[in-house]
Amino acid sequence: MEVDSIAPQPQEKIEEIESADLVVAILADLDSESLAAVCNDLQTLEGSPRLAVLQNEKSGAAAHAHAETAEKSTFPFLISRPLLRPDPAGTPALSMFAAYQSVFAAGEKLGARACCVVASKLDNAPPRWICQMAKPMLEKEIDLVLPRYAPHKFEGLMNSSIISPVTRSLYGKRIHNPMGPDLGVSQRLYRKMLGAERNPRLNGIHALASLASAALCANSQVYEVNLGARVYPPTDWANISSLMAQILSPFFLDMERNAVFWQRMRGSVPLPTIGDPVPVPQDTGTLEISRMVEMFQLGNRDLQEIWGLVLPPATLFELRKLSRVPVEEFHMPDELWARIIYDFALAHRLHMITRDHLLKSMTPLYLAWVASYALELEKEKGSGIEQRLERLSAAYESCKSYLVSRWRWPDRFNP
């Protein structure tokens, strides 16, 4: 981030934000009414902290409208600047990671005690939720505040099936959304992220993939805040392989860096939570289950050479049996799925093949888990979703000894 050009605003407006206690970045595409509501809420924070609100500026006509909104705003702390860069290479996850580093750099420039990021639109969000996220860092010196969204059945499944349960198993805290994306970060933690980015020995680190683990490994305090249901962008199932590689590679790298810490952890405990649970929305989404099962069957036929490098014989045998099951009876056991993820994390560490190729080869296995999960939840309500994901997380914990054994003795432990 070019800190000397922190906002394309008139000089008098820049001078008003030479320093701030709290930097809030608006990455979500909020309308003027929603943006005003966020700004109004922030002004009610106890102690009247100095504010800097960075609104993501879009290109073309949208950029002009955003800049005009910021300039005419009655909020002197609202500025408009490009935070999310265009993504011609088709790497949305990496673009998002870079945006957070830019926000943290702005926080460092302004000497902010904390940074918050509003990356999502929310359904039925609690009043003043942005204040609930900011207050713990300003008043209690909490280092990380993460969202707990009201769950959708078929949204955020990469987080629900991999990121969240693996984080819980590794670090012993029941974090529902380790990568946010709506979150609050203390000065101590965002400076740590910036320092890691500048360290050439930590190549590949990304803020969203490492925030939760960095806080937990430092024994910092982490809170969750109950939010409404997140409005997710449509899932691009045609390009899910690329997205998996973009998200899981930095996640697995971070897992490797922290191995000394997480190998000692056993069990898990819940996090302190702010606010009351938000009612679960009606969920009418559907998935093409038959198509997902077909993709798994094709993968089982065509990817045996790669899977054979990663997965032990017992797992390959179970997958071959699963590939012959009719769609209506299709079921992937949670323990099998957890062991598969752990095996791919180990293969990523050992560079068995190019990492991008390795992670993309996971796609048929991921689709198999999604199909199995969708079949179970076709008629479930909100409570069923959370209970189902709790069983999955418990399976990851029960299989952690498998991970530790394979991690320590990858050549000897091959059941």
Question: Where in this protein do the model-derived segments appear?
Answer:
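A recurrent flexible, glycine/aromatic-enriched loop bordering the glycosyltransferase active site
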Residues: Y149-G156, S169-G184, R201
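Short hydrophobic alpha-helical runs that function as membrane-insertion/retention elements
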Residues: C116, L202-G204, V222-N226
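Conserved phosphate/pyrophosphate-binding and hydrolysis machinery centered on Walker-type P-loop NTPases
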Residues: M179, G204-I205, L389
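Terminal low-complexity segments of carbohydrate-biosynthetic enzymes
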Residues: M1-E2, A20, A67-T69, S249-P415
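Structured catalytic core of nucleotide-sugar glycosyltransferases
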Residues: E2-R168, R188, K192-G195, A209-C217, ...
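Short acidic (Asp/Glu) and glycine-rich catalytic loops that position anionic groups and cofactors
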Residues: V145, L227-V231, F317-K321
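Catalytic beta-strand/loop signature of glycosyltransferases that borders the donor
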Residues: N177, N219-R230
